[in-house]
Amino acid sequence: MDYLDLGPYSSASGTVRLPGSKSISNRVLLLAALAEGETTITNLLDSDDTRVMLDALGKLGVKLARDGDTCVVTGTRGAFTAKTADLFLGNAGTAVRPLTAALAVNGGDYRVHGVPRMHERPIGDLVDGLRQIGAQIDYELNEGYPPLRIKPATISVDAPIRVRGDVSSQFLTALLMTLPLVKAKDGRTVVEVDGELISKPYIDITIRLMARFGVTVERDGWQRFVVPAGVRYKSPGRIMVEGDASSASYFLAAGALGGGPLRVEGVGRASIQGDVGFANALMQMGANVTMGDDWIDVRGIGHDHGKLEPIDMDFNLIPDAAMTIAVAALFANGTSTLRNIASWRVKETDRIAAMATELRKVGAIVEEGPDYLVVTPPEKLTPNAAIDTYDDHRMAMCFSLVSLGGVPVRINDPKCVGKTFPDYFDRFAALAKA
């Protein structure tokens, strides 16, 4: 097995420019593909998840021209030209869910599948929502999970569409992005959310990006959304992808644990991503954080004792960045509790189980619940722990921070970071000092 040994490091400082946001990159690619006109996308993330989206769009007949982190997309005016396609989408939820919805109303024969883990990640709530408007979608293996077979269908909207919001916000995102393509009797479609909507900031990203492409979604709280029906997305001409706020969390934590000063460029006060809220959680734990419109600085910890304060917080809004808090909790002077993180169980791996297992390897006492994690740090971190990463990019990046505790750590299968941040470990090593 491939592995990477890190540390021991005693400090971290410098400046890092973030790669483009995964969530924004894949949304913008699909919107540009469906729009009227040509869109130039800059700072597009180059990673496994964006590559599978680009490959799929190419197979669907979308004209794409890539040059470094810039991509010029020629829109299809709302309908893909390829009416049959077999689409492999890896483990990219940001590609599988929105593309499934767009294909369901495109009048073609499609197969959507991915890696084995993708076939364990639920999609039934989205399929149920699409079937309400007449979509013909069949499960190839297990009910409620990919692979999917999508067939031509007569699509019509007669009543509000209901979708569950408590498993993944990507189901709602997929519906919102697709519904403008569908005609409705009174020129609008209503989507109603059953249960509490999780990861609300990701829906905010979707609505803001749709607006950039000329389609305005009205919402009543987070339970009812009104989407214009039978309209065309219009290219904004140029659009820049902001830095990935989830990826920022590792460097911000490094600036706290390693003393800093460490500056992250590409996200800040003006960001449309909810995961910039990670900086506020870090401040609650005692880190010295300052923020500009598109940068965040961290300069160590503001306590004389030099340790973070423990935290007890609801992380429903920022589940991805919350993983970094779980590892930062190793450096606190007491027990931390991460609440409302049930969505971790259906991500790239069961992140609650994986995080509990690996935190114990470095000496933590961990209590694992259905939707919470309680982390009590050890007196001293266990050196030379071999961290398993479960083919989950965020597990690998989170546990790199252990090396800032003055102990070496081994990361197994480090290449899994290719999903969102292929050169993460090079960037981390450039900032960490022995």
Swiss-Prot record:
Pfam family, one: EPSP_synthase
This protein's UniProt keywords: Amino-acid biosynthesis, Aromatic amino acid biosynthesis, Cytoplasm, Transferase
Active site: D320
A GO cellular-component term linked to this record: cytoplasm
PROSITE patterns reported in the protein's UniProt record: EPSP_SYNTHASE_1 (PS00104), EPSP_SYNTHASE_2 (PS00885)
One GO BP: aromatic amino acid family biosynthetic process
GO molecular-function terms, A-Z: 3-phosphoshikimate 1-carboxyvinyltransferase activity
The enzyme's E.C. designation: 2.5.1.19
InterPro entries from the UniProt entry: Enolpyruvate_Tfrase_dom (IPR001986), Enolpyruvate_Tfrase_sf (IPR036968), EPSP_synthase (IPR006264), EPSP_synthase_CS (IPR023193), RNA3'P_cycl/enolpyr_Trfase_a/b (IPR013792)
SUPFAM superfamilies referenced in this protein's UniProt entry, alphabetically: EPT/RTPC-like (SSF55205)
Binding-site positions, phosphoenolpyruvate: K22, G93, R121, Q170, R351, R394, K419
Catalyzed reaction equations: 3-phosphoshikimate + phosphoenolpyruvate = 5-O-(1-carboxyvinyl)-3-phosphoshikimate + phosphate
Record's subcellular location: Cytoplasm
NCBIfam families according to UniProt: aroA
Assembly, per entry: Monomer.
Job description of the protein: Catalyzes the transfer of the enolpyruvyl moiety of phosphoenolpyruvate (PEP) to the 5-hydroxyl of shikimate-3-phosphate (S3P) to produce enolpyruvyl shikimate-3-phosphate and inorganic phosphate.
Family per record: Belongs to the EPSP synthase family.
Name of the protein this chain belongs to: 3-phosphoshikimate 1-carboxyvinyltransferase
Gene: aroA
